[in-house]
Amino acid sequence: RKWLWSFFALVASALALRDYCPVNVPQPVPKGCIKVETYNVYGFGGASENTAEYKEMLEYLKNSDANIFCAQETSYSEGRKKELEDAISHWRYRDTVYVGTSFSGLTLCSDFPILNRHVTTFPSLGHICAIYRLRVGHDTVVVVNSHFVSNAMNDDDKKAYREMILSPEEEHAKNDFMRLCSKVNRAGQKRAIQVDSLMDYLETLGDVPIIM
């Protein structure tokens, strides 16, 4: 009898496995589908024009076959302007919006015409959301390019978190735990307000396809 219960438990686990560890078999790309990419480019690799990250990003942008490309934190110096514009020139329609600091830029590159744009701003510096209407064939599709508050953990916080996980018995672990929980909780509250603000606006658009 024990083996029978074990068998049922194994079958039940196997049925649920795909939900937690999905294994996707490659399938042909459906005809007429839209490929979308979105990245936080973090100022295109930092301040130096010769960094490996910057050159790699330029190459990636040049070779991207996405129909719609969304980027966050798209700041750049005047010295980079021509190179970056050349890298994204294969997208016919392009738009960048800045609110507050120049580092908070959002960029949309599209194969489809941009009909209009709505910008939602938030109290926290550098966080904005741009909602676009694109003409895709005979349809109108809404594309959301958003930059919400993150979990607010800096490099020191991440280091403290790793040490807390590896050595939970250390005296400072409890204090670090309480401090990080408080910090992430505050960031989460700000992010929730931003998400609610976006959703309130999207509800006014009615029944239209939305890419987020």
PLM segments and residue spans:
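Active site of divalent-metal-dependent phosphoester/diester hydrolases
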Residues: Y93-L108, N175-T204
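Structured beta-strand-rich core segments of catalytic domains in phosphoester-bond hydrolases
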Residues: W5, V11-P30, E49, K62, ...
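Active-site beta-strand/loop signature of hydrolases that rely on acidic residues for catalysis
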Residues: K35-V41, E53, M57-K81, V142-H147, ...
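Acidic/histidine-rich helix-loop elements
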Residues: T38-Y54, A152-A187
